[in-house]
Curated annotation (Swiss-Prot):
Cross-referenced Pfam families: ATP-synt_ab, ATP-synt_ab_C, ATP-synt_ab_N
Name recorded for this polypeptide: ATP synthase subunit alpha, mitochondrial
Species of origin: Arabidopsis thaliana
HAMAP family linked to this entry: ATP_synth_alpha_bact (MF_01346)
Record gene name: ATPA
Gene Ontology BP term (one): proton motive force-driven ATP synthesis
Cross-referenced PROSITE patterns: ATPASE_ALPHA_BETA
Role: Mitochondrial membrane ATP synthase (F(1)F(0) ATP synthase or Complex V) produces ATP from ADP in the presence of a proton gradient across the membrane which is generated by electron transport complexes of the respiratory chain. F-type ATPases consist of two structural domains, F(1) - containing the extramembraneous catalytic core, and F(0) - containing the membrane proton channel, linked together by a central stalk and a peripheral stalk. During catalysis, ATP synthesis in the catalytic domain of F(1) is coupled via a rotary mechanism of the central stalk subunits to proton translocation.
Amino acid sequence: MELSPRAAELTNLFESRIRNFYANFQVDEIGRVVSVGDGIAQVYGLNEIQAGEMVLFANGVKGMALNLENENVGIVVFGGDTAIKEGDLVKRTGSIVDVPAGKAMLGRVVDAMGVPIDGKGALSDHEQRRVEVKAPGILERKSVHEPMQTGLKAVDSLVPIGRGQRELLIGDRQTGKTTIAIDTILNQKQINSRATSESETMYCVYVAIGQKRSTVGQLIQTLEEANALEYSILVAATASDPAPLQFLAPYSGCAMGEYFRDNGMHALIIYDDLSKQAVAYRQMSLLLRRPPGREAFPGDVFYLHSRLLERAAKRSDQTGAGSLTALPVIETQAGDVSAYIPTNVISITDGQICLETELFYRGIRPAINVGLSVSRVGSAAQLKAMKQVCGSLKLELAQYREVAAFAQFGSDLDAATQALLNRGARLTEVLKQPQYAPLPIEKQILVIYAAVNGFCDRMPLDRISQYEKAILNSVKPELLQALKGGLTNERKMELDAFLKERALALI
């Protein structure tokens, strides 16, 4: 029987359709929850999952695979686990945990997953970056050589910080650690206003770990009032957030800061504080049944912080010359810097600023212990004029502390010792500074020059702050600008005449 032309055409059409038929099925690897509790879910069936991969629970909550065992996978839940039940389906996403990054993040407050929590709507144009990446290699780095000014006289003169450095802020609770960090963010306002190009601007990322929501709210208000939020990103994993989010927040903030570092820009990141991150990680590790070590922390708690802080770096000229400067904060208990976490972080960082309760209560604020505080690489980045002025400052303060300890026992001191005590008390007074009042570097140089060269020696202690205000208000702007370039003999003569005139008015 011969087919009609129409039937033959239909047959050919069906044959070609059958040959070209391809069913595009979406295949998901799924597992089932075996047990859940305390923010940890044990899941059976996810045989191909990667370490650090994101998973999705049936109720929409996300989680991350941390323990890969023979039978089950230990997953930390990023959110409430009350709605997750035994037998629920868990789906692999195929992607490692990532967060949004880019300039669209500036001025925003986000959680540890990068989701905005400030009520200003969704994020605009941004890119996704993995939270866990390898730190830049040796050849991709350059030694620190540009200053990162905090606006604090005691820090910029004695423990200078460079762009790309890691400087630890360590001290007991309520000693002013966060204040130093916030002052540093506020000080970038006047530096950014002078920046002529994008590569000179300093962007800031503040990561709040395990803090009260009220504290974070006050912080946002402080930054908003100073117009500092426009160049800052806030990542908040507060005390009420689950431990996995407190563990993740520093890595998320670091990924956001790395966007600027890798695109030839400069960023400052503050982790406030890493003690709480270590506690959150200990909680997760113990619930995942990992073996505990010293102080019940898991064996890899050093790696927890080292892999985070190594990502702060100054990039080489070939890779864009960007930088990421880190100011991690560690809270000590009763001044014990030899505990496990403090010693770990001290050994990882490029120096530390030690704050003491006793100094704080004596009214020396910022309460920096100059003897214990060091900056291992920052001096290479210090301005020439500041170096010239501060040469004798640290030595004189060290001699003062030594003599002051003995002076308590007797009053019959010779003239040289009396002069040393007198000078030391005035230098200590000059280094005091109110909170949220950072000073530009040229003004710091002027004030410290006056103190080091004896212009305050005959002045009563209670008049020193008055003298400081007087010289800062009446100095010529061109002389201030000239100070940045260094101290020549002509400038010294001009400065001496000006400072002497102002000092005589107050003695």
